[in-house]
Amino acid sequence: MLDANKLQQAVDQAYTQFHSLNGGQNADYIPFLANVPGQLAAVAIVTSDGNVYSAGDSDYRFALESISKVCTLALALEDVGPQAVQDKIGADPTGLPFNSVIALELHGGKPLSPLVNAGAIATTSLINAENAEQRWQRILHIQQQLAGELVALSDEVNQSEQTTNFHNRAIAWLLYSAGYLYCDAMEACDVYTRQCSTLINTVELATLGATLAAGGVNPLTHKRVLQADNVPYILAEMMMEGLYGRSGDWAYRVGLPGKSGVGGGILAVVPGVMGIAAFSPPLDEEGNSVRGQKMVASVAKQLGYNVFKG
């Protein structure tokens, strides 16, 4: 049994130490994100047996953004299986910024990773659906199953993103021209933009991590969401590419599968044990929450979790 007092103390200490850390700035290329109060901060644990510990602004709802890629990858694995995902998308880090097209040019249009924009747009196109609305509803449903039924689209975030997503539209057409997109290019881009525009809070984000930690069973609803055999593929991708250009540094220092989003959220998974999540809007130059990284790393260190330890 995990010690409840120790878990709450770890969360409290991480929040106290890092919630007012200076550095970073909000994502400014999406108007909605630029206007989120920069002083917000939260950290939470949800264990694989369903216990919740949190500190700070843990009820504040923020844009899921790139963390949504984890959910869509999970659904693609359920729909088409791990071999098809590897063949059609790839399973390798790009070593490039999350919105780069260089990897597409270097690898014949294949996107390489489902956790960067090109691969995520292609992954969205893999979801079994007869039309854009069905594709979107299935992706929203998997987000809700993994994290909580209150996860929902923000029209304000979506509008803010749809009016500025020219780069992603270009990526979608590049994928389409190379034969690595499996539905209409603008449909894929539209649904991808919507999946990034849902709102979540820090406890729900930790619940997403706890569902992965529990082998695909949501510990709060006790419902199986994913096949257990698919979870290791998700965690492997998170370890390799979850924090963009900081992924190697994260693996070296923290040693947990992680995923960040430019909305300020960050998630880590301790397989079999818990999900750890944090939120704070100011980002480093790679697009990862400055305070969030520190808070999650602090919790993991205090509790002694690192997948590379014996």
UniProtKB/Swiss-Prot annotation:
GO terms for biological process: glutamate biosynthetic process; glutamine catabolic process. Disulfide bonds: none annotated. Keywords: Acetylation, Hydrolase. Its EC number is 3.5.1.2. It is an enzyme of class 3 (hydrolase). The modification N6-acetyllysine is found at residue 294. Substrate binds at residues 66, 117, 161, 168, 192, 244, 262. One of its GO terms (molecular function) is glutaminase activity. Belongs to the glutaminase family. NCBIfam families: Gln_ase (TIGR03814), PRK12356.1 (NF009020). Homotetramer. Pfam families: Glutaminase. This is Glutaminase 1.
